[in-house]
Swiss-Prot record:
This is Adenylyl-sulfate kinase. It is an enzyme of class 2 (transferase). Its EC number is 2.7.1.25. The gene is cysC. Catalyzes the synthesis of activated sulfate. CDD domains: APSK. NCBIfam families: apsK, PRK03846.1. Pathway: Sulfur metabolism; hydrogen sulfide biosynthesis; sulfite from sulfate: step 2/3. ATP binds at residues 31-38.
Amino acid sequence: MSDIVWHQHSIDKQSRADQKGQKPILLWFTGLSGSGKSTLAGALERALFDAGFHTYLLDGDNVRHGLCKDLGFSLDDRDENLRRVGEVAKLMVDAGLVVLSAFISPTRAERERVRALFDDGQFIEVHVSTPIEVCEARDPKGLYSKARAGEIKNFTGISASYEVPTAAELIIDTSKGDLATQVSALLDYLAAIQVIDSEKLKKAI
């Protein structure tokens, strides 16, 4: 490693952000399977994209088709999965993007390791706090049924614990209210912390 050095390029993160007219940031959606993480993150990205903002959504299932397809679901593999995602998200934030990620990420330690990669204010934890009863009733992939039947081991919420965030910047229960209202609340928050230009957003709505 002593022969590997970091190359400082002439175009930095702030220059890329200024070009795009936004504040680069990572919104980390965490919650149980079926809580609505991907749906909420996807709807928010659509609203931002349609308003002209530069975004990218990292989805827990999608990254396992390429970046993390060599990983299983052991504790070590799950840790490595999130480590890779965190590093990719860091590169995307450095590129000036508003990055959204939707991962169960069940432990506080995992989430804090990702947070530590970013400057203050660039990691926004969104706890999708939908109750497990609602998540299990939805069961869009049939995973809860398989977990209850013992077909899936170490399933978060059933046979493995989920550590509720203690200091999430935002908490959203998708069983309360409609998707449009929840996305609006997220947009209001992003405007309040000056990630996005509220006037630009208003023109697009």
